UniProtKB/Swiss-Prot annotation:
Subcellular location: Mitochondrion inner membrane
Name of the gene: COX7A
Name listed for the protein in its UniProt record: Cytochrome c oxidase subunit 7A, mitochondrial
Residues annotated as transmembrane: 59-81
Any GO BP: mitochondrial electron transport, cytochrome c to oxygen
Mitochondrial matrix domain ranges by topology: 32-58
Species annotation: Drosophila melanogaster
Side Mitochondrial intermembrane, residues: 82-89
Length: 89
């Protein structure tokens, strides 16, 4: 069983290496270069966190997520308070 797993790992590792070395530059798909542009945009050293380097939609989505998380934490605090302090009748 151990030899089978080693053979599978070896076949995957050597195939990927051969495949990348054998492909000429003119046969690389356009999508690869588009992905490289996006990676360069997100890896720029501009002091902004990665989750804020996207578009305005990403920024709004981040702020809405933080706001909803704070509302949820506040709701849990209120629930714990109401359950721990009984109402006076």
């Amino acid at each position: 069983m151990m030899n089978l797993s080693r053979a599978v790992v070896r076949s995957f590792a050597t195939t990927a290496g051969r495949r990348s070395a054998a492909v000429p530059k003119d046969q690389i798909e356009k999508g690869y270069f588009e992905i490289r542009k996006v990676q360069e945009h997100f890896q720029k050293k501009d002091g902004k966190p990665v989750f804020l380097k996207g578009s305005v939609v990403d920024n709004v989505l981040y702020r809405v997520t933080v706001a909803l998380a704070l509302v949820g934490i506040g709701g849990m605090g209120k629930l714990f308070y109401e359950l721990s302090v009984p109402k006076k009748e």
